[in-house]
Structures are given as structure tokens and as C-alpha cells.
Amino acid sequence: MNFFTSAVGSKVFKRNNFKYVAIAASSIGLAAYHIRKDAIALDIPNSTYQHVSKNRVPPTDGDGITKRLKEFERTVTVNKDGIFRYDFNQVASNDPCEDDHVEVIDRNIDEGNWYFWGIFDGHSGWNTSLFLRQHLVPAVVRELQKCTASYYHQNACPSSLALDKSISEAFAKVDHQIVHEHVSHVFNNPESLQVAASLLLPALSGSCALLTSYSAKSKSLQVACTGDSRAVLGECTPDGSWEAIPLSRDQTGMNPDEASRLEVEHPGEEVLRNNRILGRLMPSRAFGDARYKWSQEISERLHREYFSASPIPVKTPPYVTAVPEIESITVNPKKHRFLIMASDGLWDTMSSEQAVQLVGEWADTVLGKTTNEKNTTQDDKQSWSLFKKTSKVIDDNAATHLIRHSLGGSDQRISALLTLTYPISRRYRDDITVTVIFFDEKTL
């Protein structure tokens, strides 16, 4: 969403509002004022910055379309710990893109590597997704270190339940920092509107979060989902077909379990209207979105002192939580071949089963043809050749392959969609961010 026309844009802050919001927008580093001092330095294989397209001319032919689709794609070859490689790509609809992402390796949790892949689907601005990219993985690492340390003297690995609890606590702490600690700091330092802008913007906007963690030591995979991004595992079945194994559930008002949870937490109150929180917000779980979490007293004080927009009437907040649902699985690379993670921009146009089929066909063509013939058994040759090809494979990056098909597949269809620029583009497509992780037993 364009910063200066969004709900957290030029009309948010009172008293020379444009000046101070402009400062916050151009210098988001001001948020470092409140970065925790115990932040952990992590190994990031590739830089993870928000992507701003340099291609302002709409593509009109196949080469132009491919160039636009490949602008931010990346392939990282790992070749160890059961991971062959991972592919990433992103195509924006908003300007700037509200999605963000992170890929991290940490070596300080236990005796092996821990891998993290995150996708953060922002809404009402990019500030919350940016904050999550900077802070969520370090927070999770801190909690996992505490968890594994408690098992060290037992010479044992933590249970899945223990790991899940640690990840959930990290999610909750980060959201508490965004929503409550920051506003307390603002109230205690009322003279600094610059700091107020930098601290409150991540609370005013919002973001879903999909974070996958993988332990090289135990081969345990945890997928933590807050919101409606999605993760699905591609499993090779004994008969040579592919099966889509869901590792997350979309958390919206259309999810019956989420609707029931909200009814229990807010008895007698109509929380869902048209399947949206208070008739406004689609995801039922998210970071930020503080208007649905602050008390009426806090919202009204912020309105008096900082905001020009009126607060949402609330009775029993919070209506939205950042506590994730977590699915855990022990990876068996013989059958668990790949994991697809994507923001809802992809899932708006295809099912989990379609995505797994597309990646399976892509792997058949691209990974199959790169097999080393001299060091490969017949079973290995066939391992990526399980499908009759039904879709044209143009890309050597699986994430790009998925995005191409989500936009229609044909050059004519993709060109029409990419010709539309923000804000008109938002009527037809969302930001799309995709990561595909490939597992391989030969890298163990």
C-alpha cells in the first residue's frame, strides 16, 4: 500500500503530521531506538531486503514478462543437513510491496544447524512485516536456546510440544513489544513525535507471519502460522504420485474453528461480520493491528494526542491474536520432497494440490535433467520423474514457476496483469511471495 495514501499515511499523526510521518517513512531505522540489546547475530545466506522493482515499463512480450518475473528470484544451494536447495521469488502488486521475508541459519541453538524461512504478509502498510523480518527470528532463537538448554544435561532433544511452546512464546512476546511496549514508550516520551512515528507505525499496520524452523540434528520441522499465509508439503507416495500435506490452516473468519474460538472468547458480541473481524479485518490472527487489541482508553488517548483518525469502538479487546498454530513433522527426505510456503496472493488463485502438482512437474523437468548420470542409480533418475508433464516449464526457479502459473501461465494473461500498476492492480492481484524448500536424503 502506498505509504502516503494508506491508513497509516499522511493523515495519521497530528501536529505537523506530514513532516513527522515523512521522517518515519524515509528513516524507518528510527525503530532501532527500541531494539532489544540481547539481539542475536545470525547467518543470513542472502540479504533479505524489501524489494522495489526497477522495471516501471509494463512488459509486452515473453522476454519482458520473464525479466519482470525473475527480477527478485533467488536460488540458494545448501547441499547438507537433508536440504538440497531453496528457491525464492516475489512479485508485488502494492507499491511498495507489503510482503517481506527472511531466510536464516543459526548455529547457536544446539549442536547442529537450525534453518529458518519466514514470509510476512503485511496489510495497511509495510511497517509490521518489516519489523517481523528484523525481530521475529532472533526472538524465536532466544526461546529455542532456553528450551534446548533445559534438555542439555539429559542428553536429549526437546519434544515437539516443548519446541512449539517456545515458538509460541516468541511470537507472543514480539507482538506484545509491537502493540504494548511501544505505546508505553510513546506515552512516557511525549515530546518525541519522531520516535512516536517509528514505534507506532508497526502497531497501526499489520502482518501475517508464516515461519518454518528446521533442526538439522533432529530433522524436526515446525511450521508456525499466524494469519492466512500457507505451507504445504509435497510428499512422494509409494505409487509414484504426489500428495499435498497441509502444514497450516488459513486463519480467517471463514475458518469454522476460528469462528468458534472468537465466539467463546467474546460471548454475546458480534465479532465476525461478513467473515471479517468487526466487519473490517480478514485474518483472525496477525501481528500489529493494534486497533483491534488496544483498550478503548488507550485508543482514545492516542487519538487525542497523535491520531486524526477516530478509533474503532471496542468492548472486549483483543479481538486478534498473534499466537500461532504450529504443525510439527519429522522430515523423511525419501518421501518428503519439498515444502511450499507462500503468502495468500498465491493461494487466491490456486489450491495446495495444484501447487504441489506444479512443483512436482517442475522438479521432474528441471531437477531431473541436472542429475549426475555417473553417480546416480536408476531409482535416483526416476525420483524427480513421477509425473506426466501437463504444464510448460520455462523457469529454472520453482517459486517463479508457481508465480507464473498463479498469474495465468500464458504470456498474454501475465502481460495484462503486470501492465496494471498500483493502485488499480490491487483489484486484480495481491503481492505474491513464495519460498520452495527441497529436501534430499543424499545431503544427510
Swiss-Prot record:
SMART domains: PP2Cc (SM00332). One of its GO terms (molecular function) is metal ion binding. Binds 2 magnesium or manganese ions per subunit. Its EC number is 3.1.3.16. Keywords: Hydrolase, Magnesium, Manganese, Metal-binding, Mitochondrion, Protein phosphatase. One of its GO terms (biological process) is generation of precursor metabolites and energy. Pfam families: PP2C. InterPro entries: PP2C, PPM-type-like_dom_sf, PPM-type_phosphatase-like_dom. Mn(2+) 2 binds at residues 121, 344. It is found in: Mitochondrion. It catalyses: O-phospho-L-seryl-[protein] + H2O = L-seryl-[protein] + phosphate; O-phospho-L-threonyl-[protein] + H2O = L-threonyl-[protein] + phosphate. GO terms for cellular component: mitochondrion. Disulfide bonds: none annotated. Residues 85-439 form the PPM-type phosphatase domain. Its main location: mitochondrion. Belongs to the PP2C family. Involved in regulation of pyruvate dehydrogenase activity. This is Protein phosphatase 2C homolog C10F6.17c. It comes from Schizosaccharomyces pombe (strain 972 / ATCC 24843).
